[in-house]
Amino acid sequence: MRANFCLFIFILLFSCGQTYNTDNEETQFLNDFVEDDTTIEKTPLKTIKINTDAGREIVDEPKISAFFQIFQGENLIEEHNIGIEIRGSSSQYFPKKSYGFETWDEAGEDLDVSLAGYPEEEDWILYGPFSDKSLIRNVLIYRLSNLVGRYATKTSFYNLQINGVFLGLYVLMEKIKRDKNRVNISKNRSDDISGGYIIKIDKITGDGDTLNEKIAFMSEYTKDGIKGINKNVHFLYEYPKNRDISDEQKNYIQGYMRDFEDAIASENFTSESDGYKKYIDVDSFIDFFILNEITRNVDAYRISTFMHKDINEKLKMGPIWDFNIAFGNADYCEGGLTTGWAYKFNEACPADGMLVPFWWDRLMQDPNFTQALKERWTSLRLNELSNSSIMGIVDELVGELEDSDAITQNFGKWLILGTYIWPNNFVGNRHSEEITYLKEWIEGRLSWMDQEISKF
C-alpha cells in the first residue's frame, strides 16, 4: 500500500509542473547542478539509435517492430531488426522508460545475434536509471556478483535516441534466461523433468495481473513458518515459460519446493540427510544473502528474486536482479539505513503485500549456516568485497561516465538533480553528491555487517 501511495504522489508531483529538457538544449541547470569540466576533452559514449516503424509509440506489450543501430560518433558499428516494448513494474511510472527487446530476422522471428560483442542471444534490455541518480547502482552490484563468482547480467553504458529524440544514459543488459552464456542449466526435456528450471518470487505482471495456477504457485507456509497457503510469497514460472511448461513439469517443481519448505520447517531442519541441505545449494544461498545484504536491498528475497535448478542438482539462488533502489536509495521500510538486516523486512513492514519467505529466518537459526556465512564473508572482505575493491569499481564506473560527458548529457535531458524522485532517501544537488552519499553509505553498511557477522 505504501509503495502504491508513493507512486501516486510521484505521478501527482510530475503532473503539477515537473519539466524535462526534451530538446536537450543548454540550460542554466547544467551550470548550477553539474560540475564544470568543459576544459577536459571528452570521448562520447556509443549511441544506440532506435527507429520504430512509421514512428509508432512504444508500448507495454505487444512488442512493435523497429530498427536498431549502434554508432560510435558518426560511424555505424552494427544494426539489427528488433521488436521492442516498455518493461518494468513501478519504473513504468517514470517518464524515462526502460525497454525490453528481441533481435529479429526480416520475417519478425527471433534471431540470436552477438549484440555489442555480447554472447549470441535474442533477448535484451535497455535499462534507464532514473530514481537512481548515481546512475550506477545496478551496474555496480552486477560487477560485484560476477567478481564473487556468481553470474549476473553483462552491462554497458550507452546514450539512447528513439525516433530522433535523445533520452539520456542507458544500460544495455542481458535478460535473465536459460542459456549456456547466461543461466547455464539444461533444457527441460520430457525424458528428465528434474531440470532445468528458473522460477522467481516477484510481482504479478501481465496475464491480467491475476495470480493463478497457469503462471505461478504459492508457498505453503506463512511468513512465520506455519503451514498454510501464503499469498504473500508466490513462485512464477520463468523457465519453462508458463505458456510452455507441462503439467508434469509443474508438478515436479511444485513438489520440490514443497519438500524443501517442509524440510526447513521441520524440527530436524539442520539434519544433513533429511533437512534443508538435501534440497538447496547452500553456497549459492550464502552468496545471494551477502550480495543482497551489502546493499540492504529493500526488495531482497521477495521481489525480482530468481532461483534455478539443473538436472539432478539442488536448488540454487540467483541470478541477482534489480538493485536500483538498493544501496540506501529507498525511504521506506528501513531501506535507507546502513544498519539492520534486509531479510528482516517482514518486521519492518509486516503489512506489505510481498513478504520474505520464512526460509531466511530459519537458515539464520542454523549455527552451521551462520558459520559458513561468516567464513565466506571473511574471505570476501579480504579480497573481492574489500572497501578498496568496491570503491575502485565505483570510481571506474563514474570515471567512464565523466570521461564521456554522459552525466552532463543525462541530467541536461532529465532535470532531476536536487529533486525528490520516489523513493529517494537522499537528494543531492549534484551528481558528485550522489556518489559521495553512495560511497559513505556503502562504507557504513560494510562496517555494520563486519561487526554483526563477527558475532556469529
Which stretches of residues belong to each language-model region?
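Internal "kinase-insert"/substrate-recognition segments embedded within catalytic cores
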Residues: D105-G108, P119-E121, G128, G149-Y151, ...
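Short, solvent-exposed loop/turn and secondary-structure capping segments
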Residues: D60-E61, L111-L115, R137-N138, Y170-L172, ...
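Middle-to-C-terminal accessory/interaction subdomains
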Residues: P44-L45, R56-I58, E78-I82, G88-S90, ...
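Bacterial Sec-dependent N-terminal signal peptides
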Residues: S15-I40
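Sec-dependent N-terminal signal peptides
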Residues: N4-L13
